[in-house]
């Protein structure tokens, strides 16, 4: 094939354990993929860090592999998507990080966020759409400023830059010329006012974070700068947090369109349009912004354990040798045999938010086999997804007609059919499952005019399979009511027995 006439978009997908680079053509087909892992560092219990230099090296190796079969001059745009919230501070002159990146999973800043929760919960939720938690960037920045020698002094003098990983990579790719982020990543820092679309001075003053260290916030599709890292000048023109990029990559451009990504845990995002909706049990976040001072918003629910339960079935119970064996095993029985599995290994996330819940298998009889447990594990992913979607519908008053899916478990036909059955809506699986990278490739291509409209992108996007609900309402109600009873029994367990939280 003569590729010289082709135009390509390069998506950099910087995750929690690996850096990936995916090359897309103008029809959004995947041309090549590069992926390199990098280590996580655990200096103390509850601490999770990355070396930013290792991230950069892994990312550039992934790029080299992804573009190995083409001429870099054919790349018309670069897009960046990233693990959200992870925090880097670096020296503005030398570009060297002043401390390791503090990862989103890190819990060291719990005392700071406990104080915020006790005293400023409503103010922070109203302004940022988030709840005070170590998960978000704000307390991580404060920790570095307070605990790393001379950093606060340098920050006060304007000599320190902060960024989430997208910002750090754009800075490196442009040789320090661009210190920017997009609306979606800014909305995960707990410092960004999602109503006014600007850094919030009240929160910055509360945490004593100088505004000078923060990047400029721009739309998710715009030329931020140019990179010479591949030998010629290429515009960097797309930027979005990983879950928001996946929503865009699922062409969920309309209000009420929703996607679920099934990974170790699951993330469910729903497009709620031009106005943020206040939610009791979910996060309100910015989905993306395609113009200055305009944003699309989303409700987000995070489920802590979905795919990780399959890993536990494989490694903890040694019930299967490889993860792919769970679907045929679960398919070997007609139903769950009355068995429910609540995967509350680390508590329950949305919409329960119970850190004291613990894992539970209930309904076991003498006739229960490992196939029934396998089925109950798969079904738990679908039940938890319904839990979140029900709250989304209730709190937004938006009706949901279908669910778009991606991530590892979305390849499982048994699970996807059960997902459609238990919610009672159509489940749609796309042809290209790399929706996070595809989403930011779309944003980058829009930013340079490779594609001209959302309608054009929607017409290119292809469906692999649709799963239509076939379960009776009576059966659906009975199964879901059993799940809710099982969850009740799992909640608060660590408090009752004094187990470790």
From Swiss-Prot:
Any keyword Protein biosynthesis? Answer: no
Q: Where does glycerol bind?
A: 84-85, 135, 242-243
The alphabetized UniProt keywords are:
ATP-binding, Glycerol metabolism, Kinase, Nucleotide-binding, Transferase
Database matches in PROSITE patterns = FGGY_KINASES_1, FGGY_KINASES_2
Residue numbers binding ADP: 16, 20, 264, 307, 408
Q: Which GO terms describe its cellular component?
A: cytosol
Q: Which HAMAP family match?
A: Glycerol_kin
- Explain the purpose of this protein: Key enzyme in the regulation of glycerol uptake and metabolism. Catalyzes the phosphorylation of glycerol to yield sn-glycerol 3-phosphate.
| NCBIfam families tied to this protein | glycerol_kin, PRK00047.1
Can you name this protein? Glycerol kinase
Organism for this UniProt entry: Saccharolobus islandicus (strain M.16.27)
- Which gene is the coding source of this polypeptide chain? glpK
């Amino acid at each position: 094939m003569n590729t010289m006439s082709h135009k390509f978009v390069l998506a950099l997908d910087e995750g929690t354990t690996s850096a990936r680079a995916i090359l897309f053509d103008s029809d959004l087909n995947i041309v090549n993929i590069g992926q390199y892992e990098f280590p996580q560092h655990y200096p103390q219990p509850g601490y999770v860090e990355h070396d930013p230099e290792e991230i950069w090296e892994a990312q550039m190796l992934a790029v080299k592999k992804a573009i190995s079969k083409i001429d870099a001059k054919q790349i018309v745009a670069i897009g960046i998507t990233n693990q959200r919230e992870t925090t880097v501070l670096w020296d503005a002159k030398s570009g060297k990080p002043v401390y390791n990146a503090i990862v989103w999973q890190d819990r060291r800043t719990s005392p700071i966020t406990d104080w915020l929760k006790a005293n400023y919960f409503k103010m922070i939720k109203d302004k940022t759409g988030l709840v005070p938690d170590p998960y978000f960037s704000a307390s991580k920045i404060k920790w570095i400023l307070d605990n790393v020698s001379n950093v606060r002094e340098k920050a006060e003098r304007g000599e320190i830059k902060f960024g989430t990983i997208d910002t750090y990579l754009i800075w490196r790719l442009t040789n320090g010329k661009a210190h920017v982020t997009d609306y979606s990543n800014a909305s995960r820092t707990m410092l960004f006012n999602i109503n006014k679309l600007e850094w919030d001075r009240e929160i910055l003053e509360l945490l004593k974070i100088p505004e000078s260290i923060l990047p400029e916030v721009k739309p998710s599709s715009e030329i931020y700068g140019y990179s010479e890292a591949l030998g010629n000048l290429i515009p960097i023109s797309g930027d979005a947090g990983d879950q928001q990029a996946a929503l865009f990559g699922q062409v969920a451009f309309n209000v009420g369109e929703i996607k679920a990504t099934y990974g170790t845990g699951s993330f469910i995002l729903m497009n709620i349009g031009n106005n943020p909706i206040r939610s009791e049990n979910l996060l309100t976040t910015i989905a993306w912004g395609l113009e200055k001072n305009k944003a699309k918003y989303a409700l987000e629910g995070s489920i802590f354990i979905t795919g990780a339960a399959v890993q536990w079935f494989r490694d903890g119970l040694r019930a299967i040798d490889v993860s792919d064996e769970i679907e045929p095993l679960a398919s070997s029985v007609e139903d769950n045999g009355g068995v429910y599995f609540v995967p509350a290994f680390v508590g329950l996330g949305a919409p329960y938010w119970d850190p004291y819940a613990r894992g539970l298998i209930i309904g076991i009889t003498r006739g229960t086999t490992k196939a029934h447990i396998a089925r109950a594990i798969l079904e738990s992913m679908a039940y938890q997804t319904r839990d979140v979607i029900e709250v989304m519908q209730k709190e937004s008053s938006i009706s949901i007609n279908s669910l778009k899916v991606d991530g590892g478990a979305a390849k499982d036909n048994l699970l996807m059919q059960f997902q459609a059955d238990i919610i009672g809506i159509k489940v749609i699986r796309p042809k290209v499952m790399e929706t996070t990278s595809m989403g930011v490739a779309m944003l980058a291509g829009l930013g340079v005019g490779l594609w001209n409209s959302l309608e054009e992108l929607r017409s290119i996007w292809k469906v692999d399979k649709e799963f239509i609900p076939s379960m009776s309402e009576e059966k659906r109600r009975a199964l879901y009511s059993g799940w809710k009873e099982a969850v009740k029994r799992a909640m608060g367990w660590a408090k009752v027995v004094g187990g470790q939280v």
